[in-house]
Curated annotation (Swiss-Prot):
One of its GO terms (molecular function) is mRNA binding. It comes from Drosophila melanogaster. Its main location: nucleus. SUPFAM superfamilies: RNA-binding domain, RBD. MRNA binds at Y10, Y33, R102, V103, D104, W105, D106, R113, Q114, Y115, G116, R117, Q123, V124. GO terms for biological process: mRNA cis splicing, via spliceosome; mRNA splicing, via spliceosome; negative regulation of viral genome replication; primary miRNA processing; regulatory ncRNA-mediated post-transcriptional gene silencing; siRNA processing. Residues 30-108 form the RRM domain. Belongs to the RRM NCBP2 family. Component of the nuclear cap-binding complex (CBC), a heterodimer composed of Cbp80 and Cbp20 that interacts with m7GpppG-capped RNA. Interacts with Ars2. PANTHER family: 20 KD NUCLEAR CAP BINDING PROTEIN (PTHR18847), NUCLEAR CAP-BINDING PROTEIN SUBUNIT 2 (PTHR18847:SF0). This is Nuclear cap-binding protein subunit 2. Component of the cap-binding complex (CBC), which binds co-transcriptionally to the 5' cap of pre-mRNAs and is involved in various processes such as pre-mRNA splicing and RNA-mediated gene silencing (RNAi). The CBC complex is involved in miRNA-mediated RNA interference via its interaction with Ars2 and is required for primary microRNAs (miRNAs) processing. Also involved in innate immunity via the short interfering RNAs (siRNAs) processing machinery by restricting the viral RNA production. Keywords: mRNA processing, mRNA splicing, Nucleus, RNA-binding, RNA-mediated gene silencing. The lineage of its organism: Eukaryota, Metazoa, Ecdysozoa, Arthropoda, Hexapoda.
């Protein structure tokens, strides 16, 4: 059984436009959002996996907005919709760097979206995690700040 290429219920709350414009953009898009990546996954690994479904136009790695280091997501854009649909079917839910990755439609990359939206610079989901996840920087950022010794006052 094939994975769905239908739109998920997630919508980018920062989309510039109406809900119907966003829906139209998602239905016509050749761009995918890829989540749950390890902070150590490289652009080359992503290209190798996603190019099995077609010609990849561009990969934009998600970055911590302050440190400019990878923060666990990226955008993959294909030249044609049918190849993006193939990636939705065959890559979503597969394992990359020992993590199950999530692939979803994106309305199209806009400059600035490559940066994490969390208060500490990474993804919001990594701010509040209480579990230890070595592939995503250890404990959640807010918890790490609470348990890390303060070395500024020495």
């Amino acid at each position: 059984m094939f994975a769905s290429v239908e739109l998920s219920s997630y919508r980018d709350q920062h989309f510039k436009g109406s809900r119907s414009e966003q829906e139209r953009s998602l239905r016509d898009s050749c761009t995918l959002y890829v989540g749950n990546l390890s902070f150590y996954t490289t652009e080359e690994q992503i290209h190798e996996l996603f190019s099995r479904c077609g010609d990849v136009r561009v990969i934009v790695m998600g970055l911590d907005k302050y440190k400019k280091t990878p923060c666990g997501f990226c955008f993959v854009e294909y030249y044609v919709r049918s190849e993006a649909e193939a990636a939705m079917r065959f890559v979503n839910g597969t394992r990359l760097d020992d993590r199950l990755i999530r692939v979803d439609w994106d309305a199209g990359f806009v400059e600035g979206r490559q940066y994490g939206r969390g208060k500490t610079g990474g993804q919001v989901r990594d701010e509040y995690r209480t579990d230890y996840d070595a592939g995503r920087g250890g404990y959640g950022k807010l918890l790490s700040q609470k348990i890390a010794p303060n070395t500024d006052n020495r």
